[in-house]
Every structure is written in structure tokens, then in C-alpha cells.
Amino acid sequence: MSSIIQNPIESSYFVEDLSAVGNSQLHSGRSLTYGDRKANIDTRSGGGRRFWSNLNDSGNSFGAVPASSMNLSYGPTKSATISSKDGAMSRSSRYYVSSELKATLPSLDGRRLSKRNAANHASHHRMPDESASYRTRGEYESSSPRVPQKSLRRYYSTRTAQRLDVRRPASRSSRYSKTSDLPPSDPGRFVDDSDLTPHTDFTNRFVDSDFDPDSGVGRSSSPDQMMSRNNNLNINARMTSTSSKPYAKENQQLISSMAPVEQKNSFSTAREQYVAPALSFAEPVETQHNHMPKTTPLRGTSTVMNGSPIGPYSSSSNATGMYGVSKGHSSSTRRPFFSDVGSSQPAEEFVGSSSSHGRQQDSYIADDSDSERSYRRVRDQYLSKPRLSDKNRYSTFSEFPGQGTPSASQSNLRRSNTVRPTSFYYEKLHIKNDNPSFQALPYETTTQERKPVVKPDSIKTVKPEKKKSKGFFKKLMHKISHIFD
């Protein structure tokens, strides 16, 4: 007989025909899947009773699904007369209906079910908790009490009903979330230009909300945009090709607009940008303190407020950085290569204090060649923060103690805390301290060596331990000899 099992809780969009699965398979306890639920077959009752394992708490009152014919009715239909152990009893059942009717009215089921839902479960006087198929019912009587399903609204709400009308499966995880309608994104794919991630996402190496206030707008991984946004150590590696450079070739100077443009209808009262100075190979681009050269994008539309004359930036204010440059269009901004800046004048900005190295030096890396300065930097690092002596330096990073400067083991540390005061002012690096079990001290220790106190009598009295060991060996040999008997 062809019959249909429907998941009663979610009025599932997926209907399975039992005749496809042979009866032998049913009795062998093979589980069927509906949407995302498993229907387990209970072999104790002759394979007749099938229950939803995750709704199990209420004695299967609502979840029990008969093997052969359909549970939930779609109107107060008179069903067949049901025979039970007590005798034949006929009742009008809202719960049973023939599978044909069910197959005819798939469209109604979501809406109707949701309407009748509350009323149905409120009336627990006759919950079909001994519901089994017409055949099986005689053999099987359940002992479980009749308890209404605990909180059915949680499982089947109006929203769920609407969702099922659109024939979307309601999965456990998506049940409460509103975003569940979006297509799931594939975690394995690379971050795309179109992706917008919140700035708290630390996996995104292009966005740092502290230093880059525009990060919320549009995000693009194209190298020249990144160049204008970040100070990247990697920056040389992703410079764009030489052909597209907007600065001057062979003394021909590029200026964004030759005459000041009066702008009658300006949309923004904001401070407008000045035009970039003409660039030639000889003069290096101005640099701010953060090593970002101040290059304005050279665009034809540059505006000058109030007819003020075109000119370079005033050198005094480098605080605001680039004036009118909107980060969105900064793809036109390019940086000169270091090789192009020209060695004719040593570029002061690139080198820092010592101009001797000319342009060979990479301006993005701090100049550590001066030993005095690097020593000072490391020393300051140690002086700046008092280090708590009882804590392992690397405890934040792993469970295991780090392989750092040899320092005391934990037990030693605890002991030596009481022995000597810790001083935070010494420079750990420069004190020669061969004994790893002590903390380095800010001064040379001048305590005289104390020789151990010797009481000559007590030393001679200590001897009898050796006799003990002799007796021990005798006993041991005696035991061993038994093995070889």
C-alpha cells in the first residue's frame, strides 16, 4: 500500500513514499531521513512505530508516526473505525486522514496547520499518543502518560509556516535567525572585493579601524588603493607597472588644471584640495612623518575654493595628510619608484638623519645601523613596563614556558620572591648573571661567601647508613636466589 509519512512538526516540504522503500527494509530498522530529521524505526513494536528522536521528551505523543497511513488530517474528517484491545471504538479523528487526500492538498497544509496549531495542542484530552497504524494498533499499547507537547510554538511558529509555504526546509540552525534567507557563503573562498566585513574581524589584513577611518566604505584589495590607505612593509612588492605612472616624462610637466576654475555650484563647503605641484625626476615627493609621500591624484576636475591661487601644499601643515583626496577614487594615485626619484640630490626625507646613504636605503624600515640608538630602544623596552616576576613571560601565548632568556623555574621564582626585592630599574640585558636560578640584580652582590658550619662529631656519627645498604643487598640477593631454585 502506498502511504506517505509527513513530519508533523514542520509540515515538511519533503514527502516520502513508503512503497519505494520495501517493507523488509522498514522492519530491519533502517532509518529514513525527512529534510534534516532522522526517523528512527523502533523494532520493539514490530517496526510499526517510528519516532523523531529530537522531539522525544514528551513520550512521543505527537511525534509517533504510524508505518502505513498518514497522521495529520486537514479537516474534521471521519476516519476509519479503529480497533484496539479494549474493543472496537469509533471516534471522529482530526489526526487521521487517507494518504490520497493528503497528496491532493499539499498547498493548503502550511497555512491550515498553522491556524489550527494552537487549538490542537491545547486540547490534550485525546492526544493520539497510542497512535500506530491501523494494523499495528492492536499489538501495541503505550504506557506513556498523555502530556501535551512541551512548547510547540517554538518548533512551529507562524514564521515557520510562512517559510514552509515557500517550500524552504526549516533547519534547526536557521529557525531563529533572520539572515538565514541569504545564501550561505563559502568559507573556503578568498576574500572578494564585494565582501564587507565588520572591522572587528581581525583576519582581514587590509582593514585596521584605528588607523584607517574610511575602512567602512568600500573595500578593495587592489594594490594601489591599499598603498594609499596603509603603510605596508610590503609596499614595494606590489607597486603597479611603470607604464601607467602619472608623473612626468622627459621634462614634460603634468599639472592637473592650468587655470583656477571658478565653481559656482559646489556641493560641499568642505576645504577643497590644492593642485599637486608639477613633478619632475629631480625633485622628490614630499613626505609626511609617517612616510606616506603627499601625492594628490592628478585629475582634471580639481577645484580651488574662492579663486585662491594654485600652488603646492603649504609645507607647515602636514597634519591633515592629503586634502581633497577621496579614498574611493585613489586608484589614480601612484607613487614614484625609489629609483625614479633621482640621486642628483640626496633625498633628506627618505634617509632620516644621516643623508650619507642616498637612496639605497629603504625608507620604510627604521634605520637601526646606529648601535647607540638600537641599544636605547631595547633598553627602553625593558624599562617601560615593570615585569611581574612571578608570571611567565610567555604565558599568554602557550601553555608551555617559552624558550626565552634563561630565567628561574616557577618554584624557584616563588621562593626567591620572598628572599630578595625585585628591582624594576636594572637593565636585564647587560648584567652578567651566570646562575639561572636567581633573578638578575641591579647591583653587584658583595655578600661574602659563607662556608658551611661543620661539627666534626656529627659527621662521624652519620656513617651507619652504609650498614643499612648492606642488609638491603643481602635481602635482595636472598629473594633473587629463590627464582633460580
UniProtKB/Swiss-Prot annotation:
For the region Disordered, what residue ranges are annotated? Answer: 117-230, 286-416, 446-466
Keyword annotations = Cell membrane, Membrane, Phosphoprotein
Q: Calcium: present as a keyword of the record?
A: no
A single Gene Ontology CC term: lateral cortical node
PTM sites of type Phosphoserine: 222, 458
Give the compositionally biased regions (Basic and acidic residues).
189-198, 371-393, 447-464
Listed under GO biological process in this entry are: lateral cortical node assembly; protein localization to lateral cortical node
Q: Superkingdom, according to UniProt?
A: Eukaryota
Keyword field contains Phosphoprotein? yes
| Residues covered by region (Sufficient for interaction with Skb1) | 1-200
From the UniProt entry, list the residue stretches annotated as the region Required and sufficient for plasma membrane anchoring. Answer: 451-485
Compartments, as annotated in UniProt = Cell membrane
Polar residues bias: start-end ranges:
171-182, 218-230, 341-363, 394-416
Q: What does this protein do?
A: Acts as a membrane anchor for Skb1 in forming plasma membrane microdomains. Promotes mitotic entry by sequestering mitotic inhibitor Skb1 from its regulatory targets Cdr1 and Wee1.
Oligomeric state and interaction partners are given as: Interacts with Skb1.
Query: What name is this protein filed under?
Result: Skb1 localization factor 1
Native species of this protein?
Schizosaccharomyces pombe (strain 972 / ATCC 24843) (Fission yeast)
Recall the taxonomic lineage recorded for the source organism.
Eukaryota, Fungi, Dikarya, Ascomycota, Taphrinomycotina
